[in-house]
Amino acid sequence: MATGRITRRGLLVGGGAGAGLLVAWALWPRRYAETLVAGPGERLFGAWLKIGEDGRVIVAVPQVEHGQGVFTALPQIVADELGADWRTVAVEPTPASPLYANPLALDELWGGAFDQVPAPVRGEWAKRAALMLTGGSTSVRQFEDDLRIAGATARALLLKAAARRWDVDWTQCRTEAGFVVAGRNRFRFAELAGAAASEEAPDPLPQGVQGAGALAGKPLPRLDAPAKVDGSANFAADIRLADMVHVAVRAGPPGDTRLVRADRAAAERVAGVVAVIENPRWVAAAATTSWAAQRALDGLAPRFETRGVLADDAGIEGALRRALAEEGHRVASAGSLGQLLSGGGVVEAEFRVAPALHAAIETPSATASFHDGRLELWLQTQAPTIARAAAARAAGLAEHAVTVHPMMIGGSFGAALDHDVAEQAAVLAMTLKRPVSLIWSRGESLIHDRCRPPVMARMRGRLAANGTPVAWHAQIAAPATGRAMAERMLPASVAEFTDLGSPGDAQAISGAVPPYRIANWAVDHHLADLPLQSGYLRGGADGYTAFFKECFVDELAATAGTEPVSFRIGMLGGDPRLARCLSTAASLGGWDGGVAGSGQGIACRRLRGSAVAVMAEARIERGRPVVERLVATVDCGRVVNPDLVRQQIEGGLIFGLAQALGATTGYERGLARVRGFDTLHLPRLADTPDITVELIRSDEPPGGVSEIAVPAVAPALAGALHSLTGKRFRSLPLVIPA
């Protein structure tokens, strides 16, 4: 590992024992009331690290664990730099604080909507708003430097404390598996923590030396696995408080909705019912058990009235077609299309994508308690400070009177960026004056899911005489999902800068720019006004823009009479990492050119600083596609933990398979038709194909991995089905025509 030098400019050294180190935001307010706190027998080493008298190394993690392995990857970075024994490492969620803001998530979740705002200004926004976000595959990329500095600083302090006792130069000491060592002398970290906390950090600070690096890139076991296996891991619905009631809720369609009828008498006849709570937009039943609450809710048989247009399939398609027929907003371009797409010889294709649901195993849930003028929530959330603000508004409280405890999440895929359940739980706790446990039913979670929106696209291109593309035009009809998210989630002072007033929405068409070397291209966003709630889904807009782009590349390759992999690589002269992923996937998968009857298809993608290529192999059985094999090659830069990366790639492939073959819904009278997993056509264990994942060694900075595998699956599978049927598949989900 290379040796780096870090100055003290970004560090403030505390004066007393245990005061530790804090990041000094010299030009900004320092009213950070909530910071990491040392418990009994613990010594604080800044905002990221504590060492206990029992030898535990406790790493503060600001990101929420929802299966992606962040409770392991981030501590591994600290432990590696510190020279710790992995068996002694523990995790502690951080409190809400500007110290743990994630400005990179502003860029990734909103698809570059804020790119015209200087990066330092974006960073200041995030810090001032304490914008703690888990999403956009940003955790390692955002926090690696801070964590390495924290580990290196604590290591230096331990070395200096040991050197003082041994009366040697501290640079002659090293750390090794939880010990400070100099010759035959050894001290456990626990024996030095108290003295080390009062030492002064050296300037410059050595990083990446003296024992560090022993854990980097190693497949260390997950820290959260034992608790999840034995059932001791707590989720939001596991919290139990004295005098708590269980609540079931049912909401009306989105829009101008009001509750017009509920049979309170029928609900109150259910044994164990405590109260019925009516809200203009929803109704809830509280009871001594969750079963009684659900039975009472069914007895209420609520009816809602909604003014305005209600979402239905015909209306959605009509709105998308009207948007596509109108003039779009140019969001990105190069060269000049001019008359290149006029006249004969133009290749054209139209694509459609149905609304896609998150379909997480754990439904939205929250536990809330109001006492002594303070509201406390245990919540599944990817944005705890935003959830706190939402709950405070709903309860009519100041934000400082609300505490949010982010819990582990049983899958989220972006759904926990929104906080309807937090608002409902806050109102219920305030109304009932006792703790409440609110769990949405499976039907409620699907009906009111903020879906990845339905989208329609028209792709047009022209080939030169030698078969290479000279013109490319993508026209995408989609709602302004990014702006809607910004209005829901971000402070008004930040949200108003989305796209700096541009009529297009960067998030809605994220990933639409081709990675290929094409002289003349343009991407237009056609804003569609749809009466449904949309949100962020794993992979973002890349989940459909990759489908449009890669399927269209296949069609251009066929028109040119060129094999699809060669066609792509010929246009990737400026991206050797993506080209290598393609060639490696083809080699590992036994790619035969995607010829008729092969059942093979291939696609590639750049996302979150990483590159991926996916080859799919499929057959058709009883009129339905059966995926037999998926081969993925990934270049995600320097890897912290290869096992975690493989888990995320494998999970992303299965998630992409679900999005390709199902996980979608139609709409009727403003609500999703889907009510349960049984109608979502999600892959079962028996449907899981053979999966091969190859990680390409790289010294590039770490890229994101939790989403990278998702977008390439659908176009690869569409290519495989084309080779079997001779037909082009231009709609998601993929359905074999009768």
Describe every region a protein language model picked out.
Residues 2-738:
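Cofactor-binding beta-sheet edge motifs in enzyme active sites
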